[in-house]
Amino acid sequence: MSNFPWLTTIVLLPVFAGCVIPFFPNKGNNLIRWYTLGVCLLEFLLITYVFCYYFKFDDPIIQLKEDYNWIDFLDFHWRLGIDGLSIGLILLTGFITTLATLAAWPVTRNPRLFYFLMLAMYSGQVGLFASQDILLFFFMWELELIPVYLLLCIWGGKRRLYATTKFILYTAGGSIFILMGALTMGFYGSNQLTLDFQNLSNKSYPLELEIILYLGFFIAYAVKLPIFPLHTWLPDTHGEAHYSTCMLLAGILLKMGGYGLIRINMELLPHAHSIFAPWIVAVGAIQIVYAALISFSQRNLKRRIAYSSISHMGFVLIGIGSMTDVGLNGAILQMVSHGLIGAALFFLAGITYDRTRTLFLDQMGGTAIYMPKIFTMFSSFSMASLALPGMSGFVAEFLVFLGIVVSNKYSFNFKILVTIIEAIGIILTPIYLLSMLRQMFYGYKFSKFTTFSNSNMDAGPREIFILVCLIFPIVGIGLYPNSVLSLWNSKVSFILSKFIV
């Protein structure tokens, strides 16, 4: 069975299963929901089975490789494969998408299209992390944008058209640089088009060309991650999207930028990365503090959490720029950790809005009396976000801290400066998160709740189940981080072996 096309099955199963949904009766909401949830769960179980039985965790090379001709005259192949870098993010995709599907249970408007788009997005994201061909990588990068665009445009809030336009302009504009860079790398040095990552990694480019390619790819990933100053689409998008879509955006979409930065910029363009690494660290440090300060000034709950996400992505940049095993391990762990925590916070923001019908913090207050379970969960995940010891965020941020401190690439003064800025960001994080909790749950009673009993307003079994599923891996990773670090540790060492610091 090792020769079975497992990865092709994993990539195509959701979208092919989604093609059946249009044949369901339009009023069969429950049937569509359960069918989609069943497909997501089956996909996640299949991913887990394949990785447990066929993936060698101590081997840094690409495994489960598949290569099929797709478009002969372009030498365009369907090339798939996984390694330690992709396995954690594919598992995260399966886990978050399954829970986001369950979170979307209240959606009743045009459910057939909604759940088809959820499954199409699932395939696009898994396909991107499994791609071993740079043109296929670009194809999956673009394919994933279409479901997000429609989910935001149709099921978004009042300003959804503005947010959708901004989202597509930023992301599609950045994608052009991936296509241009991919074709340049593919044609360079030969009339034969070379697109697979393995052959591209063996190519040598003039330093000037490598720098230009690096900057082009970096712009695309800076939009997606996002990196200051190309981040402004994210708060608008999160502010208008349905909370199940927000879970996918925060949990998976942002991680595509970090993945591309490691997979292409670090692995394929190591000389340019060595030059730009100090700038990446500097931007990451500035982003942590800048986004934290902006987050504190936000009145809108979802926008505050969105800026919190931008701040936390600064740690990913510092870890990538540190060029140490510890720092890069921390960066990847931060992507996984934030995927879980960010998805939980946006889900909590969504179910809070369902009850209060407002996202403005200054219009809330005293809701802990009416929503004690939501209050408990919101407090727990906020503690995880501010990197409380014993939770995954603490381990990730500590590794990034340690990575920059032990790096031999930077001077003592530079490391001290970056560490101080990081520390300021870590101090600001509890300020805006605890302030958020105070405004939401403490103080005067929320007047709109006076006619409801506590049991009517608090989280139900479905919502509690989603939150418990998210808190378990956050605490588990925090207490035993090696359970996930072992997935990509050998790959991190392999990537950094290309650099001489």
UniProtKB/Swiss-Prot annotation:
An annotated GO cellular component: chloroplast thylakoid membrane
EC number: 7.1.1.-
UniProt keyword Lipid metabolism present: no
First-level EC class: translocase
GO biological process: aerobic respiration; ATP synthesis coupled electron transport; electron transport coupled proton transport
Signal peptide coordinates: none
Family, per entry: Belongs to the complex I subunit 4 family.
Subcellular location: Plastid, Chloroplast thylakoid membrane
Keyword set, alphabetical order: Chloroplast, Membrane, NAD, NADP, Plastid, Plastoquinone, Quinone, Thylakoid, Translocase, Transmembrane, Transmembrane helix
UniProt cross-references to InterPro entries, sorted A to Z: NADH_Q_OxRdtase_chain4, NADH_Q_OxRdtase_chainM/4, NADH_UbQ_OxRdtase, ND/Mrp_TM
Primary localization: plastid
TM regions (residue ranges): 4-24, 35-55, 87-107, 113-133, 134-154, 167-187, 211-231, 242-262, 274-294, 310-330, 331-351, 386-406, 416-436, 464-484
GO MF, one example: NADH dehydrogenase (ubiquinone) activity
Reaction equations catalysed: a plastoquinone + NADH + (n+1) H(+)(in) = a plastoquinol + NAD(+) + n H(+)(out); a plastoquinone + NADPH + (n+1) H(+)(in) = a plastoquinol + NADP(+) + n H(+)(out)
Topology class, membrane: Multi-pass membrane protein
Protein's name according to its UniProt entry: NAD(P)H-quinone oxidoreductase chain 4, chloroplastic
